[in-house]
């Protein structure tokens, strides 16, 4: 990335490029963002673990949306039925930060829908015949939405998890595995809560990853995490993990996450998730 674009890196979302895309740049497209980004970033690779090559032009541009100063937090899905790729993202508009959806047939060029879908930091999943999303309700808590389709109206159902920042979702049978971090933790780390999707009952909460390595900020002082951009606030790496994203392939589960605050993207393989 150009120096002006690499001072903040966050919000990963990974897909395996579908077979119906001709001449892809690689087998995997990794979308990510800048907290004050003017476009959604993308890198590509032939292996999940990389190395990844930056697609310098980026994908969806701020100028192609109705947002004012930035777009970020991509959440990307393959809609096999329509042969399209859906990208949820958020940006600032009249009334605050909201989530929108854009569509692409190649994973690079996106057409935007100007109708807001809900609050920001959407992570969308499907259960039975409904679509759901977990989003951040300003800096208060999280909110669960329900919709009949990818780009339909998302109606709020209920709130959950005070101070949640960003989340990731994985569904197995009738269980939602919700990964998240929280503003105000010392240090900010990744948690997992299991939720029964038929009763919406939370079953278990556990901390699964905390900053330990140097590249995660593990050698830095413990501080209470704050809202907003870590690099804009501090101008340096901090001891925080944020922005989880879950990717599943060949019975293997991977978690991508923002490390040292918002100074890079890490990848970890998860074990024994959903076995008990």
Predicted regions and their residues:
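Beta-rich carbohydrate-recognition and catalytic domains
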Residues: 1-73, 77-239, 248-276
